């Protein structure tokens, strides 16, 4: 059945026939309803091996498939993009199936091979329904970055061979949507969060085209970093599932290697796994215990070859995953339980440079010659000199920061932008029924730093040192009590713990809490400071010790400030992180209904 289902605020559209009609026409629904067969429509949208559909053509192709196969498919609007156009989800099979696979295309519309591959794959499956495994649902986002997709051009991908035209990396607000899955500055990301949690995929694929070195294979793969993923899923992924994907791709003549993230200027010096933290698509998926794969088709291979390699991966993925049946979903349930059984969770990682593996790498010989442009040495890969040799491979990561897993988080309702993102991720919570005071674990930010230049609309902040203590906290009717015994537990820890590499704190959601609001005038405070030292011998001794240590470098203003922060006048909430915790093992009041 051809359906236009909506999530969240888009329900307002589905309930309004006039607005719904406008949405459908904007999606060129008329094409799907006027007898144009999917094959003809697809041929129009990919008129040559070096072309890729425009946004409306991709949407129309999936709409036509849904119209032609109503008993097997749905076509849904799940939100609105920043450019005002709808976001779509095409599904084959029942969303309640034991195995659910989600494919996201054109997060970077200049890298569109997944769009072509997904249309071809869906067509292939629907024309041969016996190839669709039982109890399996496949969901496809035709083009996620709609704004970037509308910005068609020939040339912004300077390193890339084809297609003739493609979209642009940034969205309508010039955001890189593959850095936006936690901060959700875009409407796209907020809608995607909600759709992702509702669909609850077991496997998530994000299709891309690479940058970087030249080498022989047409496809490389970023797999959810196993050490970061952790738990029973990680062992199965690394030792069983991922090796099967590589082996089956090779058997079909489409050799695939890990993503080429070079340690040095060329792969000869080795490669290191790409660490997809939660800002990235598959890193976000890992917060919900989904296995993620990012396909990276090689930029210098012909576009048709990149599409073919991506298509083959989708086929192999479905075939391999279907053999596991409901095993993956059972592993994910075990993963959630394993996470909650721990007292601490890693929230930042780095490559372990002491654990070096070896990878047989099919590359091209790198040569250096003099540039006719700059007069300096330049790099050239010699395709007439291919090689296969072992190179160092850094595949092991270790945590660098941990955060406690509490019994519950407490989030004041004042931080509404955080609450909005929690809602999008299906977080369950209770509201404080009346104003009250609770003794909670309070985190004070003792050291932090921010990037001097903006990055994706923010000055990224790193929290370097915190202190936790139990203190009375004033709460107000409507504040959130968030128990951890829920499926979103890992998402909560990694976004609400200030140490998290992609926590809300890192993306400036709580910056105003760091600022001191009241100060003193020295000429007024001098008498108070003198009285403090006279009446408190211990304070006076500590003050003299500080003076001796800092000497002449300790200015008179700094000395008074030291005393001010130990006086009753100091507000005490500056640098107090405004999310609180109920430590593990303690009772949680106001349980959710």
Q: Model regions: which residues?
A:
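Structured catalytic-domain cores with a bias toward divalent-metal coordination
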Residues: 2-8, 12-22, 41-593
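Bacterial N-terminal signal peptides
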Residues: 26-40
